[in-house]
């Protein structure tokens, strides 16, 4: 699977860890930055990663900042993006199964590397259930106008 990654300075170390983890599992990664721990603005990198998913260049995206909140908000401003902030595997599974989320946000200050790996693995392997959830996702998409 081709996956976009984005982070700010607070998520840099975890992004680099997840990047290596994904590549070790055979995934192709598009790293949208940031590329250091120098202070930067999370909306830039949340949007950049989301645009890769929006365009179809990437199938899914993962964004990381200290809490995951700001960067998830940034990603969700991009039309067609459903980015869910997850801190444990069950939320990652359910957001794929019920919300057809195409992006995952995590907070580097909230979870460790092992938990992040578990969340990512579940997020990438869970499938959308469709059915009644298809209608609900359609209603979400309609809000975008």
PLM regions: where:
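C-terminal binding/interaction regions
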Residues: 4-6, 10-11, 89-145
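Glycine-rich phosphate/diphosphate-binding loop of Rossmann-like nucleotide-binding domains
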Residues: 5-24
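Short active-site oxyanion
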Residues: 2-3, 58-61, 80-82
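A short beta-strand-loop structural module common to alpha/beta enzyme folds
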Residues: 28-39
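Short, structured active-site "lid" loops
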Residues: 45-63
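Charged helix-capping and loop-helix junction motifs
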Residues: 43-47, 87-88
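Mid-chain, well-packed structural core segment of small domains
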Residues: 63-64, 69-109
């Amino acid at each position: 699977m081709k996956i976009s990654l984005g982070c700010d300075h607070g998520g840099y170390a975890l992004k680099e860890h997840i990047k290596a983890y994904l590549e070790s599992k055979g995934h192709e990664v598009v790293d949208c930055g940031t590329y250091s721990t120098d202070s930067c603005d999370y909306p830039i990198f949340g949007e950049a990663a989301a645009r890769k998913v929006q365009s179809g260049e990437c199938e899914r995206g993962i964004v990381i900042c200290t809490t995951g909140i700001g960067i998830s908000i940034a990603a969700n401003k991009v039309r067609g993006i459903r980015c869910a902030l997850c801190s444990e595997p069950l939320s990652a599974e359910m957001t794929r199964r019920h919300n057809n989320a195409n992006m995952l946000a995590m907070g580097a200050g909230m979870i460790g590397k092992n938990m992040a790996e578990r969340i990512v693995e579940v997020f990438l392997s869970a499938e959308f259930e469709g059915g009644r959830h298809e209608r609900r996702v359609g209603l979400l998409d309609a809000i975008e106008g």
